[in-house]
């Protein structure tokens, strides 16, 4: 089944991409959740027009993404979390908590969906966190999870 993605789907593509997926995945998940629309010739033409406008906008956004990357690279982010014996957290650190900690540390407002975590953060310590700011720009910073 051919579909056109309307949102970024991990492992599949970016908005505007035309991809081939299995019928069940498209019909039962992507289409009802609003992640994609069914492919037609008219929809494909519309997507090419939108992509052209988006590419012009991305050139401008690339400069902003590099600026945000510069802010994040030198940032020290500390997140206070409750922990038990041995430094094991009660629960785990979420992307939303990391975004709030970056904002509290004086960093820019980030989109939690673009964070790339090294796995589930369930203990105290220092963790590398990456964020995809732009298709061509990825920033990295260290997150310190401390007893709070």
Curated annotation (Swiss-Prot):
InterPro entries: Ribosomal_bL9, Ribosomal_bL9/RNase_H1_N, Ribosomal_bL9_bac/chp, Ribosomal_bL9_C, Ribosomal_bL9_C_sf, Ribosomal_bL9_N, Ribosomal_bL9_N_sf. GO terms for biological process: translation. Binds to the 23S rRNA. Belongs to the bacterial ribosomal protein bL9 family. PROSITE patterns: RIBOSOMAL_L9 (PS00651). Signal peptide: none annotated. Pfam families: Ribosomal_L9_C (PF03948), Ribosomal_L9_N (PF01281). The gene is rplI. Keywords: Ribonucleoprotein, Ribosomal protein, RNA-binding, rRNA-binding. NCBIfam families: L9. GO terms for cellular component: ribonucleoprotein complex; ribosome. SUPFAM superfamilies: L9 N-domain-like (SSF55658), Ribosomal protein L9 C-domain (SSF55653). The keyword Translocase does not apply. This is Large ribosomal subunit protein bL9. Disulfide bonds: none annotated. GO terms for molecular function: rRNA binding; structural constituent of ribosome.
